[in-house]
Amino acid sequence: MKKNLTELVFILDRSGSMGGLEQDTIGGFNAMLTRQKEQEGEANVTTILFDHEVQLLHDRFPLKAVAPLTEKDYYVRGCTALLDAIGYGVEKMANIQRHLPESERAEKVIFVITTDGLENASKRFGYEKIRRMIEREKEQYGWEFLFLGANMDAVKEAARFGISSDRAVRFENDTQGVAVNYHVVSETVSRMREAPCCASIGAEWKEQIEADFQKRHHR
């Protein structure tokens, strides 16, 4: 196990319903990367974009070498192949960790999955297969998965593929909501990278996102 090395895997929705929030997403993602670069410790970044297709943007790039996201990288189109994106990411990272020498395997693996809509276009993976894959990596290797979903019951949806309620949150999919999302994700990933054990981070990480959503939907 390589101490102080974290594999960061970002799975970002770029389906058509994200239209109008491209600059917010790009700005939030880049600010998060800047914050992570300032932190001690090594990290590799894998970024997977998805609509009706899955695109690998960053393939375990050293964190400090990752260039800012641009409009050429992130543009919206199509439907939501959420399960295919998750399955691709988990399968890829598991294969890498399995075949690396023990001394080179990351101490921590953290997935951050962000979507503004429910699965509707996957062809390769289904809910049950994804659930088994995620639960295996969580239980055997301590991987962490954060799920941020808009326009849905995010806790209920996350449970369908093996992510517990304390790691799932619903957000408001607008400029303010996206900004809060990336601020909280950056803070949480930083805490997980610093912590002796990611599991020590409780459900409190998502309180700011929940408060933002509830404030705008208070009756």
How would you name each of these model-derived features?
Residues M1-R219:
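Acidic, low-complexity intrinsically disordered regions
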